[in-house]
């Protein structure tokens, strides 16, 4: 698994800024999809009040997608062949994963490799390292047709649908 060092700032006594934590982010797999890794880097649930403590909430309490006003900061690793249908595989399983719609605006940055964005109208756009995507809550899917692993970071901002 790809590790990520995560440095989190916070306010200590007297509201003086400090490093609240410095360590590895939690990385998990995705059931049924070997090679997919999700690093949950940080999350907020909105509410309008800034929590400058730098104390991480238990990520197991958070839904993957944020509520309105909430955010999720994730790094996702996509293995070669992700989102491409193996002729012997259950096609509906790939279709469910490939195309999805969320009540979020997602800001993404490709860090390594390439991913192909697939939209309902059949259009596709291939993103490479350094490219950015603003995904505005529309149905979309991802494919990695390259022979190398793709890595992207996303900030998901929750909205009412």
Located regions from the model:
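Short, small/polar residue-rich loop motifs at catalytic or cofactor-binding pockets
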Residues: 3-5, 102-103
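Double-stranded beta-helix
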Residues: 6-12, 16-21, 27, 145-161
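Short, surface-exposed charged micro-motifs
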Residues: 7-8, 107, 141
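Short, electropositive, low-hydrophobicity segments enriched in small/polar residues
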Residues: 14, 39, 112, 117, ...
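A short glycine-rich, His/Asp/Glu-containing loop-to-beta-strand
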Residues: 20-98, 104-105, 159-160
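Ligand-binding loop in jelly-roll beta-barrel domains
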Residues: 68-72, 116, 124, 128-131, ...
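A short beta-strand-loop-beta hairpin characteristic of the jelly-roll/cupin
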Residues: 93-102, 107-128
């Amino acid at each position: 698994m790809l590790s990520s060092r995560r440095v989190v700032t916070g306010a200590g006594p007297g509201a003086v800024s400090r490093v609240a934590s410095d360590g590895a982010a939690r990385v998990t797999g995705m059931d049924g999809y070997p090679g997919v890794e999700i690093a949950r880097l940080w999350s907020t649930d909105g509410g309008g009040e800034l929590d400058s403590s730098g104390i991480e909430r238990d990520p197991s309490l958070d839904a993957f997608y944020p509520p309105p006003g909430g955010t999720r900061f994730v790094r996702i690793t996509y293995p070669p062949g992700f989102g491409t249908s193996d002729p012997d595989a259950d096609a509906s399983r790939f279709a469910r994963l490939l195309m999805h719609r969320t009540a979020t605006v997602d800001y993404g940055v490709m860090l390594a490799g390439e991913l192909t964005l697939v939209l309902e109208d059949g259009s596709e756009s291939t993103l490479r390292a350094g490219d950015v995507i603003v995904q505005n809550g529309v149905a979309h899917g991802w494919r990695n047709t390259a022979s190398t692993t793709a890595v992207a970071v996303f900030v998901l901002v929750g909205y009412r649908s």
